[in-house]
């Protein structure tokens, strides 16, 4: 009886909230509204949202549970909001799971826009670009070459490449963040991030974000998420303590040293509050969540596409041999020299266009009344950029669903993609991610030819339907044939 009464009360409150919201917006010229909730059942939501533009245009509203949101489906509207009117759209909604995962939105990716948020972002960006500038690129290259040596030992055997890429990117983040690439630490943080993301993506958590009052009811998934967060925070705090006990003022060994010392000297320009150690804690969390699985997923998509397009792989290897020397050369190439490898750059751009890791960018919130595409957008409205939809817009891209890296080699023929977002909320680790994609694919294609196991068993190019907010390739395996070895001899050796 009590439960029934509580449900009735919560339903009435939700209905009253909805009616009040509609009354406040009655005089505004709002984007058209998609009726019903069937869009929530679509297996590929970004593509479905793009299809709605044929009737509704590139900007419209829909309901995600009790929350009404505005969806942007074109490069033009996304750039209008996120670049030209970036202050209006720089906020972040206070979603229940976001607050839980980010220590009440104390991190950069999920934190709301404020002067304190700007100071936090500035400190972390400085650590990425200044604190490790001298060591970032050489270490990415060294860790990648060590990865290739491990793969050479397994040459001939089918390899689950997604996991290998995930461990590689985690080792890079571990070294840049903690100055430590020991296997035990890398595997511990890798497993921690995997567990956290799997739990966070579960439907039992996603439903709480759409219907927040359900958090008052028993939810085993919510308990598991809290346990994963507690484990994550314990591991990060242990590393912060180790750094505080051993660091030397005015010197930094890694990003954590830089940020801990930066907290002591950086002040917010005006207003209450200042950066605390908790902000460094959440910067570390951001680096692991945003810098491991995302880059590993893009690398996995690149391998999958190259298995489907061996002619592109052959041209890439010819380009590498021509510019850097034949086979598994160790010739030094820096990221500044990337203009020498236009096809490699175009291939990376095409993978990012077709398979942006987060196809629906994290939701934004308007900080004040604004407009997009001639429509009124009230203050506090949640806005979701459909990045994948913008990348598949037939009015912008010729044959948008085709994997065709050469489109980026045609002068002035194609605009840049928005895989890392844009404006104030652009991905903080974009420069590191692009460096990793460039170095890893370069070294991998220098050392190996990618082959499916067995012949003809190609990976699916349809996203994993159980991957949550990230766009992941379905599990697959690949054989890595060392270059410079005759195919027949290699096949005989690998069969023994």
Curated annotation (Swiss-Prot):
Catalytic activity: progesterone + reduced [NADPH--hemoprotein reductase] + O2 = 21-hydroxyprogesterone + oxidized [NADPH--hemoprotein reductase] + H2O + H(+); 17alpha-hydroxyprogesterone + reduced [NADPH--hemoprotein reductase] + O2 = 11-deoxycortisol + oxidized [NADPH--hemoprotein reductase] + H2O + H(+)
Binding-site residues, progesterone: 232
Assigned GO CC terms: endoplasmic reticulum membrane
Compartments (UniProt record): Endoplasmic reticulum membrane; Microsome membrane
UniProt GO molecular function: 17-hydroxyprogesterone 21-hydroxylase activity; heme binding; iron ion binding; progesterone 21-hydroxylase activity; steroid 21-monooxygenase activity; steroid binding; steroid hydroxylase activity
BP GO annotations: glucocorticoid biosynthetic process; steroid biosynthetic process; steroid metabolic process
Membrane topology field: Peripheral membrane protein
Residues binding heme b, per UniProt: 109, 364, 425, 427
Keyword field: Endoplasmic reticulum, Heme, Iron, Lipid metabolism, Lipid-binding, Membrane, Metal-binding, Microsome, Monooxygenase, Oxidoreductase, Steroid-binding, Steroidogenesis
Top EC group: oxidoreductase
A Pfam family: p450
Domain description: The leucine-rich hydrophobic amino acid N-terminal region probably helps to anchor the protein to the microsomal membrane.
The name this protein goes by in its record: Steroid 21-hydroxylase
Recorded name of the encoding gene: CYP21
């Amino acid at each position: 009886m009590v439960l029934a009464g509580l449900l009735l009360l919560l339903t009435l409150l939700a209905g009253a909230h909805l009616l009040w919201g509609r009354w406040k917006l009655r005089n505004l010229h709002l984007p058209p509204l998609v009726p019903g909730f069937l869009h929530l059942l679509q297996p590929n939501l970004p593509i479905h949202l793009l299809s709605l533009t044929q009737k509704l245009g590139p900007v419209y509203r829909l309901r995600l549970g009790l929350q009404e949101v505005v969806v942007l489906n074109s490069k033009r509207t996304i750039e209008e909001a996120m670049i030209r009117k970036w202050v209006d759209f720089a906020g972040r909604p206070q979603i229940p799971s976001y607050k839980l995962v980010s220590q009440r939105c104390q991190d950069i990716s999920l934190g709301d826009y404020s002067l304190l948020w700007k100071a936090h972002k500035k400190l972390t960006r400085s650590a990425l670009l200044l604190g490790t500038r001298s060591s970032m690129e050489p270490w990415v290259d060294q860790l990648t070459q060590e990865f290739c040596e491990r793969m050479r030992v397994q040459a001939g055997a089918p390899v689950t490449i997604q996991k290998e890429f995930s461990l590689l990117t985690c080792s890079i983040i571990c070294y840049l963040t903690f100055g430590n690439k020991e296997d035990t630490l890398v595997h511990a943080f890798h497993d921690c991030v995997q567990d956290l993301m799997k739990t966070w993506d579960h439907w039992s958590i996603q439903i709480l974000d759409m219907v927040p009052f359900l958090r008052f009811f028993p939810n085993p998934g919510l308990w598991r998420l809290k346990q994963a967060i507690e484990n994550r925070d314990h591991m990060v705090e242990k590393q912060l303590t180790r750094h505080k006990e051993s660091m030397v003022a005015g010197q930094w060994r890694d990003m954590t040293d830089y940020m801990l010392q930066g907290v002591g000297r950086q002040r917010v320009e005006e207003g209450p509050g200042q950066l605390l150690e908790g902000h460094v804690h959440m910067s570390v969390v951001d680096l692991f969540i945003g810098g491991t699985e995302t880059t590993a997923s893009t690398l996995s998509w690149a391998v999958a596409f190259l298995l489907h397009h061996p002619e592109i792989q052959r041209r890439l290897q010819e380009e590498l041999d021509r510019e850097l020397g034949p086979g598994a050369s160790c010739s030094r190439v820096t990221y500044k020299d990337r203009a020498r490898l236009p096809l490699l750059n175009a291939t990376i751009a095409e993978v990012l266009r077709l398979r942006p890791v987060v196809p629906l960018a994290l939701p934004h919130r308007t900080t004040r009344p604004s407009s997009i595409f001639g429509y009124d957008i009230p203050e506090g409205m949640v806005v979701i950029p459909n990045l994948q939809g913008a990348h598949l817009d037939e009015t912008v891209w010729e044959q948008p669903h085709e994997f065709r890296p050469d489109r980026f080699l045609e002068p002035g023929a194609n605009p840049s993609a928005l895989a890392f977002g844009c404006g104030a909320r652009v991905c903080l680790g974009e420069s590191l991610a692009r460096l990793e994609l460039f170095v890893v694919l370069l070294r991998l294609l220098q050392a190996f030819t990618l082959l499916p196991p067995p012949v003809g068993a190609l990976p699916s190019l349809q996203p994993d339907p159980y991957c949550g907010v990230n766009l992941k390739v379905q599990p697959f395996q690949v054989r890595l044939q060392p270059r410079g070895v005759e195919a027949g001899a290699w096949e005989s050796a690998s069969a023994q």
